[in-house]
């Protein structure tokens, strides 16, 4: 264990064995943990599967334990952890709840799919979406009086749209209801973006920017699928040759997802092991698909998805990512590629094109991704959020 690793672990005497075990700390953990322990706010930018969650939750828990001498009231909400999707809330909550429990820190989830948060006996940590947080804040603002930390995960997924503007106001409303708003700490996590300072200042002030680029190598190849993707048989041949049985296929629309799922079932001559995943599919069905993909057996597991699988739901170690069409942005490309080979230092990706023009787009986007060139998307506020938040405030007790 090197000196930096040892020094950081010594600063986390209560939690490092729970959250970080004995493996080497990742770059984002080495950079973030000292900043969070010092009490500073931070925006943490790092690739998928880099250990961002542990980089944030471990020092926060250490501070909670030290501040209350390990005997803090188990019926006070101290940390609200805001996450873009219900599926990711469920995934992170399941991953962390037992670890938090070992530290005598109570936790709960509140979404449209799962709500075990106790209004009269609030747990210490709440994992939720912006919408569910808004509902809770409107009906029970007193819950947030003891709040110490606000965490915003996958912020790039929310920023610069209706939900991001909703979150901006929610953060201010939470602070307004806190007994000690000036002592609140804010932590946001994001994928690579062009102008991190501009994004961060929309949500909180007095922050540090932590950037961990990661060093995963992108192995990329294009596949000509022909008109209407009639040559997808090539995919099957490559999978057999390379002994690939676990892959995620990304599409830009639900319609395309349904089309490709049907074609893959015809090509592989089977229905089992080939799944369709998007937000319109029943939540329980989605969860079962995610569980099946997370299994480590040798059975064929192919999942065709929209952006519903773009952010960090745990679906195990995917051997290859297949892009059925060029993503709309470089950021989206990086997120999708990041879903593959999460336990290694490389990620393998195929870009499937129907027309020669898409092949050129793929080549240019991959070159931009490898060289850190991210598009700058101009921020534009959504005025309709103001109307929604005014209505929400009228219900606030």
Q: What do these predicted regions represent?
A:
Residues 62-92, 177-183:
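Conserved SF1/SF2 helicase motif Ia
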């Amino acid at each position: 264990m090197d000196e930096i690793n040892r020094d950081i672990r010594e600063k986390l005497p209560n939690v490092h064995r729970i959250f970080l075990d004995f493996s080497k700390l990742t770059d984002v953990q080495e950079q973030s943990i000292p900043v969070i322990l010092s009490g500073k706010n931070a925006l943490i930018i790092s690739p998928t599967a880099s250990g961002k969650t542990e980089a944030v939750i471990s020092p926060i828990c250490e501070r909670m334990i030290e501040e209350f001498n390990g005997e803090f009231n188990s019926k006070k909400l101290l940390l609200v952890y805001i996450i873009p999707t219900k599926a990711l809330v469920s995934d992170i909550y399941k991953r962390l709840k037992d670890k938090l429990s070992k530290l005598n820190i109570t936790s709960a989830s509140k979404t449209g799919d799962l709500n075990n948060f106790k209004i009269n006996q609030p747990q210490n940590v709440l994992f939720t979406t912006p919408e569910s947080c808004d509902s809770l804040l409107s009906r029970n603002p007193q819950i947030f009086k003891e709040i110490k930390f606000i965490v915003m995960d996958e912020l790039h997924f929310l920023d610069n749209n209706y939900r991001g503007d909703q979150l901006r106001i929610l953060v201010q409303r939470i602070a307004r209801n806190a007994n000690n708003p000036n002592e609140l700490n804010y932590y946001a996590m994001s994928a690579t973006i062009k102008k991190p300072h501009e994004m961060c200042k929309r949500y909180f002030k007095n922050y540090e920017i932590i950037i961990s680029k990661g060093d995963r190598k992108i192995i990329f190849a294009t596949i000509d699928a022909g008109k209407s993707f009639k040559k997808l048989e090539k995919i099957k041949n490559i999978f057999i040759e390379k002994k690939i049985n676990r892959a995620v296929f990304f599409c830009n629309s639900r319609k395309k997802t349904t089309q490709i799922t049907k074609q893959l079932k015809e090509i592989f001559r089977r229905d089992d092991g080939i799944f369709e995943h998007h937000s319109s599919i029943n939540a329980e069905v989605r969860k079962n698909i995610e569980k099946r993909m997370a299994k480590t057996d040798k059975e064929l597991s192919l999942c065709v998805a929209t952006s519903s699988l773009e952010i960090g739901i745990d679906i195990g170690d995917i051997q290859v990512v297949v892009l059925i069409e060029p993503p709309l942005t470089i950021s989206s490309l990086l997120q999708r590629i990041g879903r593959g080979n999460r336990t290694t230092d490389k990620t393998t990706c195929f870009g499937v094109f129907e027309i020669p023009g898409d092949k050129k787009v793929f080549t240019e986007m991959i070159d931009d991704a490898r060289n850190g060139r991210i598009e700058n998307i101009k921020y534009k506020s959504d005025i309709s959020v103001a109307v929604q938040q005014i209505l929400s405030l009228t219900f606030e007790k």
